Structures are given as structure tokens and as C-alpha cells.
């Protein structure tokens, strides 16, 4: 019964977001998918509660490269790159900003996390031109299966599987599997496989 209710809610959510999908399709033709996506997710970001989660997921399942039916996206979260992917059982907390990112299954992203599309999204080499006019390069950031990203972290490099990234950390270099990292810039403070098992 519960699964049937969830399926019905997902179907209704898709119907409700169909005007937003049409608007996205029209704007995408003129602005490109990424600019159109950011505006659409801003509008959907302000819908609170479980209803908002269902509506955001229904929209993102159509417009992103991948968004699992079990993904949860909280209030205030904005996506800026249509190439983003959210695998099964991912959770994105409130007020996050996600660029070109792949969240593998069972990833937890706490409130206020930013994942720009790598660390070189803005060029800075030409001192005679404004930074906004210098372009930049986007890179896919992968956050590995079972990883937990703490509140207000900034992730600009890949994070391995089953990691913990501390609140407020700034990840500038790739992190291997099974580590705990914290600080600015983030440094490995321990290896989870070295910890004794807890009862």
C-alpha cells in the first residue's frame, strides 16, 4: 500500500511540474540547459516540506543526466549544471548549491554545502581583464558511495567512497576512500578502516 501511495505521489508530482518542464524546454532553446536549469531550480527550491521534495525530484528526473526515484532534495537547493547525477538513496540538505557533480548511492550532503564544477570555474590569469570575462573550465566532481559531506563544506575535487568531510571544510584535492577530512584546505585527519569496530 505504501509503495502504491508513493508511486501515485510521484505521478502527481510529475503532472504538477509539467508547466515548469515546458518553461525549462522553451528557455533551454534560447539560453542553453544550464542557465535554464538554474532559474527553474530556484523557483522549485522555495517549496517546503515533503511536497517540495516530490516536486523537485520529479523535475530533476527529467532535466538532469540522472536523478534516482529515491533521491531527496531539500528546500533551498539549486542546481546549475544539467550534467549532474544523483544516484539511489542520495540526500541533499537545505540551501545547497550543486554544479557538475555525481553523487553516488547513499551519499549524504548536509545543509549549505557548495559543490562548484571544480576549482577552475573562473579564469584569473589575465590581470588586464575582469575575472568574469576570462571564462574557466568545468570538471565533473564525483562524491563516492556512502560518503557524508558536513554542513557548509565546499567540495572542488573528487571525494572517495565512505568518507566523512567535516563541517566547513574546503576540499581542494581528491580524497581517497575511507578517510575523514576537515579544515581549510581539507586534510585527512584519520583513516576509517584503522578505527576499531564499535559495538
Predicted regions and their residues:
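Flexible, glycine/small-residue-enriched loop-and-beta-strand segment within the central core
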Residues: 47-60, 65-66, 75-87, 91-159, ...
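A transmembrane-helix-recognition feature enriched in membrane-embedded lipid enzymes
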Residues: 1-70
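Conserved functional loop/turn residues at catalytic and ligand-binding sites
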Residues: 102, 173-174
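Extracellular disulfide-bonded cysteine-rich modules/repeats
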Residues: 178-179
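Polar low-complexity intrinsically disordered regions
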Residues: 1, 198-199
Amino acid at each position: 500500500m505504501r509503495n502504491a501511495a508513493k508511486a501515485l505521489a510521484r505521478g502527481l508530482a510529475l503532472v504538477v511540474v509539467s508547466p515548469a518542464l515546458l518553461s525549462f524546454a522553451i528557455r533551454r532553446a534560447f539560453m542553453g540547459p544550464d542557465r535554464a536549469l538554474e532559474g527553474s531550480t530556484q523557483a522549485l527550491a522555495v517549496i517546503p516540506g515533503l511536497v517540495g521534495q516530490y516536486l523537485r525530484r520529479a523535475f530533476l528526473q527529467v532535466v538532469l543526466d540522472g536523478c534516482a526515484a529515491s533521491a531527496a532534495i531539500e528546500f533551498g537547493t539549486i542546481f546549475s549544471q544539467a550534467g549532474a547525477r544523483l544516484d539511489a538513496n542520495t540526500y541533499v540538505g537545505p540551501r545547497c548549491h550543486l554544479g557538475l557533480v555525481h553523487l553516488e548511492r547513499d551519499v549524504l550532503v548536509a545543509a549549505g554545502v557548495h559543490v562548484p564544477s571544480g576549482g577552475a570555474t573562473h579564469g584569473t590569469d589575465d590581470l588586464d581583464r575582469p575575472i568574469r570575462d576570462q571564462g574557466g573550465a568545468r570538471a565533473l566532481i564525483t562524491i563516492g558511495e556512502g560518503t557524508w559531506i558536513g554542513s557548509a563544506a565546499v567540495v572542488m575535487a573528487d571525494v572517495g567512497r565512505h568518507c566523512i568531510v567535516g563541517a566547513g571544510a574546503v576540499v581542494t584535492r581528491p580524497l581517497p576512500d575511507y578517510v575523514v577530512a576537515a579544515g581549510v584546505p581539507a586534510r585527512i585527519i584519520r583513516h576509517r578502516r584503522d578505527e576499531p569496530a564499535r559495538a
